[in-house]
Structures are given as structure tokens and as C-alpha cells.
Regions:
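Bacterial N-terminal signal peptides that target proteins for export
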Residues: 1-10
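Short, surface-exposed coil-to-beta transition loops
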Residues: 114-115, 142-147
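A short hydrophobic beta-strand element
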Residues: 124-133
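Hydrophobic pocket/interface hotspot
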Residues: 60-63, 74-76, 83, 95, ...
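Short, low-complexity N-terminal intrinsically disordered segments enriched in polar/charged residues
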Residues: 23-73, 77, 178-179
Length: 179
């Protein structure tokens, strides 16, 4: 065996070991829902079955389609009846009513709000998303980010945690001075 062939064989062997060690498998090829926000980047835990991973990604897509459109008919297909918001802002109702109130209030301030999924990380029974929101308020551009963690069971979101860049949003809305 020539040195060149030996080197190629060893290189291929090392690549195969790395791929196996990283858990790269075909089952991470998830068919995304049409006409729903699509993640720009997605990482899926290789220990999940394709069915589990697909259900979790689809739940996230429907959830962010709700935030993107405000269509309340998505809620029953997206979250459980006893959905719980772990980072509920003061004054907002808990559960599915809280989601509706938040979206309605948001759309009063930024009627053309648009939600994009920048990154989606699917691990165990949780989905973590890095999101960007854009729109306009009184002809002024709005652009801020958020991070969500969703607990998914049987294809529906049971609870969430979220953190929005409220400083940037409030500055862009003119509620506080920009530095």
C-alpha cells in the first residue's frame, strides 16, 4: 500500500470516528412545517428518535408562528391546556390566556412584529431558541432579541422560560433614553 493510500485511509478512518463520536446521524434530518418560521440553524440531540425530534421542532415552529402572526388558533395545537410560564411578567395572566394577552398587547405597540428563529437547540425534552423580532413602531424600526427555553411533552409545550432584550426594545420604543 502506498503512503498516499495509507494516508487517505487513515484520514477517512479519523473522520468516521469523529462523526460517530459527535453523534451525527441521518435521523436529525427533520422535515420542517411549511408556512411556519424555519430555524436558520438547528442542532438536535442525537439520542432523540426522529419522531421525538420532529415533534419538538414542530412544536417550536408553531409557537413562533403564533408570535409571528398573532393567530390564536395555533395555541391549542402548540401548548398544553395547563401551560405554565415560569418567567411571567407582573400583571400578565398565567397559561394560554397570558400568551393571548401578551401577543395582543405587543401587536398594539408593534403591529407588524415579525419573529425569526435564529437558532434552535433540541436536547432531551427541551427546546432552546434564539429569536429575533423586527417591526416598526410609529415609523421607527424595532429590532431586538430573545432567548426561550421550552419544555415539550408529546409534541406540545408544557412550560417555558423566556428572556427578552427589554432594554433595547424600550430604547427603540422611546420609553427610556438610549446611551
Amino acid at each position: 500500500m502506498s503512503m498516499k493510500k495509507l494516508f487517505m485511509f487513515l484520514s477517512l478512518f479519523v473522520v468516521c470516528i469523529v462523526l460517530v463520536a459527535c453523534g451525527v446521524e441521518e435521523k436529525t434530518e427533520i422535515h420542517l412545517l411549511k408556512e411556519m418560521p424555519k430555524p436558520k440553524a438547528m442542532t438536535i440531540d442525537s439520542s432523540l428518535s426522529k419522531k421525538e425530534a420532529t415533534e419538538m421542532v414542530h412544536a417550536a415552529q408553531r409557537f413562533y408562528a403564533f408570535w409571528d402572526t398573532g393567530k390564536e388558533n395555533l395555541i391549542p395545537h402548540t401548548v398544553t391546556e395547563n401551560f405554565f410560564d415560569n418567567t411571567l411578567p407582573k400583571g400578565r395572566p398565567q397559561g394560554t390566556e397570558g400568551l393571548k394577552v401578551a401577543a395582543q398587547n405587543f401587536r398594539k405597540v408593534v403591529p407588524n412584529i415579525h419573529c425569526e428563529i435564529e437558532d434552535l437547540l433540541v436536547v432531551g425534552d427541551k427546546v432552546t431558541a434564539r429569536l429575533s423580532f423586527t417591526g416598526t413602531h410609529n415609523d421607527k424600526k424595532i429590532n431586538f432579541f430573545a432567548i426561550d427555553m421550552l419544555h415539550v411533552k408529546d409534541g406540545k409545550i408544557t412550560e417555558d422560560w423566556h428572556l427578552e432584550d427589554n432594554l433595547t426594545l424600550k430604547q427603540q420604543l422611546g420609553l427610556i433614553a438610549e446611551e
